[in-house]
């Protein structure tokens, strides 16, 4: 692995992916396919002799467990891992837990696609009295209640992801650390859009598959050059 690379991986398939539900901040488990995907991602990394100095993931178990499977396969379970809510999936608001086909039937394909893929359009917000509100979860008890999302666009997701990149991850890259980030489709989309200056219309077409390693290439000054999937 070159020192000027960062590896991104979306978590493996979850039980709610299989059920075709909007997952967001719901803490869905990996299903069997997702576990196998995580192990296969590690095999791809091992084949190319990737080795990491540090790893980052979200506070959601589908990402945490994907990372654990990968580190186990790479014989790096001892690696220091930083977990942050800032790498969580975007919050799907009132859509969380709903079947995507049923939502499409109710609101239409065009509207749902905008909620899912556009840059600045948020889904309907959740009410703080709703049992699904993350403020009820002890893992977010350290957050100011005003920082806990009620429903996010990609733009809002980026506003929490990018500061984490700038303050925590990028200094590690500047220090020549080899970095692995296991997170979620939209938190990774937000990061890729920011680094590679993808415009707000083009980002609509970017859909990141589960457990497919993405290699970010940087020049010697640690400026992003290109990105590609490891296959």
From Swiss-Prot:
Q: Which PROSITE patterns match?
A: PG_MUTASE (PS00175)
**GO MF assignments:** phosphoglycerate mutase activity
* Reaction it catalyzes: (2R)-2-phosphoglycerate = (2R)-3-phosphoglycerate
Q: What is its EC number?
A: 5.4.2.11
Q: Where is the active site?
A: 11, 89
Cysteine pairings via disulfide bonds: none
Q: Which InterPro entries match?
A: His_Pase_superF_clade-1, His_PPase_superfam, PG/BPGM_mutase_AS, Phosphogly_mut1
Pathway annotation: Carbohydrate degradation; glycolysis; pyruvate from D-glyceraldehyde 3-phosphate: step 3/5
Residues bound to substrate are: 10-17, 23-24, 62, 89-92, 100, 116-117, 185-186
Residues the record marks as site: Transition state stabilizer: 184
What keywords appear on the UniProt entry?
Gluconeogenesis, Glycolysis, Isomerase
GO biological process terms held by the UniProt record: gluconeogenesis; glycolytic process
- Which SMART domains does this chain map to? PGAM
Q: Which CDD domains match?
A: HP_PGM_like
Q: What is known about what this protein does?
A: Catalyzes the interconversion of 2-phosphoglycerate and 3-phosphoglycerate.
* Subunit details: Homodimer.
Extract the NCBIfam families matched here: pgm_1, PRK14115.1
Which family is it part of?
Belongs to the phosphoglycerate mutase family. BPG-dependent PGAM subfamily.
Protein name (database record): 2,3-bisphosphoglycerate-dependent phosphoglycerate mutase
**Protein source organism:** Buchnera aphidicola subsp. Acyrthosiphon pisum (strain Tuc7)
């Amino acid at each position: 692995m070159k020192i000027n690379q960062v590896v991104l991986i979306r978590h493996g398939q979850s039980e709610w992916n299989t059920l075709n539900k909007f997952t967001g901040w719901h803490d869905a488990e990996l299903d069997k396919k997702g576990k196998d995907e995580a192990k296969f991602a590690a095999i791809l990394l091992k084949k190319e002799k990737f080795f990491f100095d540090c790893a980052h993931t979200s506070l959601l178990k589908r990402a945490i467990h994907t990372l654990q499977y990968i580190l186990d396969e790479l014989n790096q379970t001892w690696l220091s891992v930083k977990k942050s809510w800032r790498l969580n999936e975007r919050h799907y608001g009132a859509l969380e837990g709903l079947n995507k086909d049923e939502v499409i039937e109710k609101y239409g394909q065009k509207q749902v696609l905008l909620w899912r893929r556009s840059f600045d359009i948020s889904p309907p917000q959740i009410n703080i009295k709703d049992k699904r509100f993350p403020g009820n979860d002890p893992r977010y008890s350290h957050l100011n209640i005003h920082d806990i999302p009620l429903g996010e666009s990609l733009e809002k997701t980026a506003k929490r992801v990018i500061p984490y990149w700038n303050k925590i991850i990028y200094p590690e890259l500047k220090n020549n650390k080899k970095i692995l980030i296991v997170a979620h489709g939209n938190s990774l989309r937000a990061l890729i859009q920011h680094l590679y200056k993808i415009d707000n219309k083009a980002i609509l077409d970017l859909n990141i598959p589960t457990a497919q390693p993405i290699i970010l290439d940087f020049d010697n000054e640690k400026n992003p050059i290109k990105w590609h999937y490891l296959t």
